[in-house]
A protein has these predicted regions:
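Non-catalytic terminal extensions that flank enzyme cores
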Residues: 1-45
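His/Glu-based metal-binding/catalytic segments typifying zinc-dependent metallopeptidases
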Residues: 38-40, 47-49, 158, 162-166, ...
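M16 family metallopeptidases and their MPP-like homologs
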Residues: 43-53, 79-127, 134-143, 170-195, ...
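Active-site His/Glu-centered metal-binding helix of metallohydrolases
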Residues: 60, 64-68, 577
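Hydrophobic, small-residue-rich alpha-helical packing segments that form membrane-like cores
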Residues: 143-217, 221-273, 278-280, 285
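Non-catalytic, conformational "gating/processing" segments within enzyme and secreted inhibitor domains
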Residues: 154, 206-237, 746-781, 975
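Terminal amphipathic helices with adjacent charged low-complexity linkers/tails
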Residues: 459-483
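Compositionally biased, intrinsically disordered low-complexity segments enriched in Pro/Arg/Gln/His
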Residues: 623-624
Length: 1001
């Protein structure tokens, strides 16, 4: 048997579809397995994973994941993880807690940075400093401001999970898993239930790490173009002090039910007001327990079946659920991250009285499909969609290696073949052959694994207007009971512990300790901006932007329709219109056939919007005024020259070169002959969009807040808020009612939108493709564009009037929804305050995010996250918090930022780390399609390579004096800034800030 650096080789295979050599090693001394994926991807990834099965819902694995990265034997800093983030070129750094495992992955394109990350991560997981104070900070602790003050709980994970438990989508996922696996580790919440987290003790915490965080329970992973031998050499050194131990961490399988079950749960909701269209709705999900991940062909068939049933608007189960009118959007699909796989299907937005009708509808639809079969075009579309995604391997902003690690763990975690989920050619070929030989193959799977499967559980999640109040009262009662049981000495100890924790939090890391952290040097940084190829052509009167990039034989085509041609009353339709084009059918095909055609012949087409400010215009004359009702408003006079922003509805498609003509054919059909007159189908699209926006409030509350806040300061962001923000959610609710009461008026609006947008004079095409394939594609693209309506673009003269006429937003706003935490924002337009752009602001923001704001809002305040954002183009600056138990206190932290910067004295090493982190963010790794889209955005907004190089030079040349200079500008934000808070009505009203309140949910 081959050995190297104390590892013995277990497997050595090539995975041609990934262009990868895969070698599986076992560390002979400890038993740790190491999967080494070797290829030419410069975005190198490593991961350290452990089986971490919880036995209760204290959130022990989750809290430990936080604390592990908060100081270790070799790096005894307060927060080496965030210090590392501050000064790394990493393309990914994080840690993730799953129901049965914890993963510590990182990635970088810089080899030395990669090894630095590895060194810190390995020491963190195997030698963390698990102090009681760290558990208190990250998990939970008592807070008592005075001996006679009320007792409270604080902790980062405690508040993070209060935010998670405010999201009905999140709760449905948790409750469905727990109801499907009630007798296993999946039956409890590894993330932590806020009502149970305070049960966690320090002894349990220490014991959990000692039990599971050992090399004998570790799965080690490497991916990319680094030296495979060096992987083994380094890991051998790290593991050398350990001996093998027996770790009982196996995840037990769930014993199948003998009969189906129904379970009911509640989520916190506000009571709907009469006539507001916001009566809280139920969520229903039907879940099946499936076999373990062993037969790769069966897993592939189940993935294809899941897509065929639910993956598109044309999918028969999805269509039956939506057509029933019982709910507003579909949920479900195949999940294979648990030991036994699951399949689920259900509805969001169900009237409580209709909740029990959903499961019978699902079963009846599956029975009909099992008997009558699928439309062959639907199966063809699903096979092509799954195959295209596997071959493209487009993981978006996540490293490809990370996606492969997570896939490998589906089997590896349970002592099965880690390569099975990675090599897809054989199972795909098997399933294709089976489908060709047995047309009823998927019908048999429906029968065996769904209809005849007694392990089925329907989870009904119902709104409860009093739940949040009951939870608060229960927490208060528990605290009062615990306070009453405390002696004077106990009270003194609680206060002393809180003081000790705060003192430790405020104590800076000694320079000699900070110096231990490995870091790159300024000389390791690339001084030059890397341009993305861009060429401009005019084709048939339309602009074509082309990027010559290697795309592995995939045509990426983005078609842009100029939204500036729309009058104000039609702007909120922008995103909906894109969906309507692709999901309502054409004169020749109904939406089912159109959807199948898209799936059969392309890699997908989806709509989005590109709305952004443009360089070089004074975009906001910020004169504060008061509206007629006495509310201060931000938006007094936008300088609405057309050139101050770009706004496009983008239809983003992709296909192989041989299928590119079919991609163009579909785009031509939807632009020229989309049927917009199907009222029922359009209602479905509107309701899906509405509930999607509602579902985003809790998990993406900081983004919702930021979109609204930035809309105070620049017309581009004001338009973004109207098209994609809270304002659009309110529009969708009104539109859903108007479809019933004034369908002819709605249809007239849609036709008017089409009349304004479908015009090649205001259109652009963005193509990302290698030169050889583009030479063949370009004539077809020119023919396609030539077939579209021409004429004068209507997108300019009137748009300034449109922007000027937009209604003002209140200067200080409270957006309310049922939540246990807040999302607190404050911002201003810095150019209006006299700021002149300098690249040093990227360095300063990096330090604020990973230093001051992190310290004050997360570590001391207990929020999950804190951010600051700045647009070099618009000058808009915003502070944001995420899952924050505080409100006014967080605003005080924002207001004190200038004072912090004024008093800041940085060592050269500290300054260098912040510069490195800023460059890492600027040079974020991108796949080819993302590069092409970034280049398009830069072109449209006037971000030239020269301007980007100047900004980079200023980043690299940042000095401490730049921090002090920005303080003078940020000082003005204290008084000139606007406030937007998303949170509960009770918290917003209790803040006493006089915020103008809008009920969002």
């Amino acid at each position: 048997m081959e050995t190297s650096h104390g590892f013995e080789l277990l497997r050595d295979e090539t995975i041609p579809e990934l262009n990868t050599r895969a070698r599986l090693w076992r560390h002979t001394r400890t038993g740790a397995q190491l999967l080494s994926l070797e290829n030419d991807d410069e975005n190198k990834v490593f991961g350290i994973s452990f089986r971490t099965p919880p036995t209760d819902s204290t959130g022990l694995p989750h809290i430990l994941e936080h604390v592990v990265l908060a100081g270790s034997r070799k790096y005894p800093l307060k927060d080496p993880f965030f210090e590392l983030v501050k000064g790394s070129l990493a393309s990914f750094v994080n840690a993730m807690t799953y129901p049965d495992k914890t993963i510590y992955p990182a990635a970088s394109t810089n080899l030395q940075d990669f090894y630095n990350l590895l060194d810190v991560y390995v020491d963190a997981v195997f030698h963390p400093l698990l102090s009681p104070e760290k558990l208190a900070q990250e998990g939970w602790h008592y807070e008592l401001e005075a001996a006679d003050a009320p007792l409270s709980y604080k902790g980062v994970v405690f508040n993070e999970m209060k935010g998670a438990y405010s999201s009905p989508d999140n709760l449905l996922d948790r409750y469905s898993r727990q109801a499907t696996f009630p007798d296993t580790t999946y039956g409890v919440d590894s993330g932590g239930d806020p009502a149970v987290i305070p049960d966690l003790t320090y002894e349990q915490f220490k014991r959990f790490h000692e039990t599971y965080y050992h090399p004998s329970n570790a799965l080690l992973f490497f991916y990319g173009d680094d030296d495979p031998e060096e992987r083994l050499r380094r890991m051998s050194g790290y593991l050398s002090e350990f001996e093998a131990i027996a770790v009982d961490s196996a995840i037990a399988p769930q014993t199948p039910f003998t009969a189906p079950r129904v379970t009911r749960f509640s989520y916190g909701a506000e009571a709907g007001q009469a006539g507001d269209g916001q009566s809280p709705k139920a969520f229903v999900e039907v879940n099946w327990l499936l076999p373990e991940y062993e037969d790769t062909a069966l897993v592939m068939a189940l993935e294809i079946l899941g897509h065929a049933l639910l993956g598109t608007p044309a999918s028969p189960l999805r269509k039956a659920l939506i057509d029933s009118g019982l709910g507003e959007d579909v949920l479900g699909g195949l999940a294979n991250y648990t030991r036994q796989m699951t399949f689920s299907a259900g509805l969001k937005g169900v009237a409580v009285t209709d909740a029990d009708r959903v499961e019978p509808l699902i079963l009846a639809t599956l029975e009909a499909l099992a008997q009558d079969g699928f439309d062959p075009d639907m199966i063809g579309a699903s096979v092509n969609t799954i195959e295209f995604a596997l071959r493209e391997n487009n993981t978006g902003r996540y490293p490809r290696g990370l996606a492969l690690l997570v896939r490998a763990l589906d089997t590896w975690l349970h002592d099965r073949d880690p390569l099975a989920p990675l090599a897809f050619e054989a199972p795909l070929a098997t399933v294709k052959a089976r489908l060709a030989a047995e047309p009823a193959y998927l019908q048999a799977i429906i029968r065996q694994y769904l209809l005849d499967n007694p392990h089925r559980v329907a989870v009904i999640l119902e709104p409860d207007a009093e739940l949040n109040q009951r939870l608060e009262e229960a927490e208060r009662a528990r605290l009062e009971k615990e306070r009453a049981a405390m002696s004077d000495a106990d009270v003194a100890a609680v206060m002393a512990n809180a003081r000790t924790l705060q003192e430790q939090q405020n104590l800076p890391d000694p320079p000699e300790v900070l110096a231990k952290l490995p870091s790159l040097k300024r000389g390791d940084l690339e001084p030059h901006h890397k341009p993305i190829p861009l060429a401009l052509e005019a084709m048939s009167g339309a602009r074509v932007v082309y990027h010559d990039l290697f795309t592995n034989g995939i045509v990426y085509l983005d078609l842009g329709l100029d939204l500036r041609s729309l009058p104000a009353e039609l702007l909120p339709y922008a995103a909906l219109f894109g969906q309507a084009l692709l999901e309502m059918g054409t004169d020749a095909e109904d939406f089912v056939k159109l959807s199948q055609r898209i799936g059969r012949t392309t890699g997908g087409i989806y709509p989005t919007t590109l709305i952004a400010p443009v360089v070089g215009e004074a975009t906001n004359d910020e004169r504060r005024t008061t509206s007629s009702d006495g509310v201060a408003v931000s938006h007094a006079a936008f300088d609405a020259r057309n050139s101050s922003l770009v706004a496009y509805l983008m239809l983003r498609g992709k296909a192989t070169p041989e299928r590119a003509p079919e991609l163009l054919g579909i785009l031509g059909d939807v632009l020229l002959s989309a049927r917009l007159d199907n009222r029922e189908r359009f209602r479905q699209i509107v309701l899906e969009a509405k509930i999607g926006a509602e579902s985003a409030l809790a998990p993406a509350g900081h983004q919702v807040t930021n979109t609204r806040l930035r809309g105070h300061f620049h017309p581009a962001y004001r338009l973004e808020e109207m098209v994609n923000g809270v304002e659009n959610l309110l529009f969708l609710r009104r539109l859903a009612e108007r479809i019933d009461g004034d369908w002819p008026g709605v249809l007239a609006d849609l036709e008017a939108v089409r009349g304004h947008l479908v015009n090649r004079a205001g259109m652009l095409a963005n193509v990302t493709l290698d030169e050889a394939n583009f030479a063949a594609f370009a004539p077809r693209l020119a023919d396609f564009l030539g077939g579209l309506p021409g004429g004068e673009s209507s997108g300019s003269a009137r748009f300034s009037d449109t922007l000027t006429g937009l209604p003002a937003l209140p200067r200080h706003e409270g957006l309310t929804f049922p939540a246990q935490v807040n999302y607190v924002g404050k911002g201003a337009g810095l150019y209006d305050l006299g700021y002149r752009l300098d690249g040093s602001i990227a360095v300063i923001n990096n330090l604020l995010r990973t230093g001051y704001l992190l310290q004050k809002i997360r570590i001391q305040g207990g929020a999950y996250g804190a951010f600051c954002t700045f647009s070099p183009i618009s000058g808009v600056y915003t502070y944001l918090s995420y899952r924050d138990p505080n409100l006014a206190g967080t605003l005080d932290v924002y207001d004190a930022t200038a004072g912090y910067l004024r008093g800041l004295e940085l060592s050269d090493d500290e300054l260098t780390r912040s510069i490195i982190g800023a460059i890492g963010a600027i040079d974020a790794y991108q796949l080819p399609d993302a590069k092409g889209y970034t280049s398009l955005t830069r072109y449209l907004t006037g971000e030239t390579d020269e301007r980007l190089q100047q900004f980079r030079d200023e980043v690299l040349g940042t000095k401490t004096a730049d921090f002090h200079a920005l303080a003078d500008v940020l000082e003005q934000v204290k008084d000139a800034g606007d406030v937007v808070v998303l949170g509960s009505r009770e918290a917003i009203e209790a803040s006493g800030l006089g915020l103008a309140v809008t009920k969002v949910l």
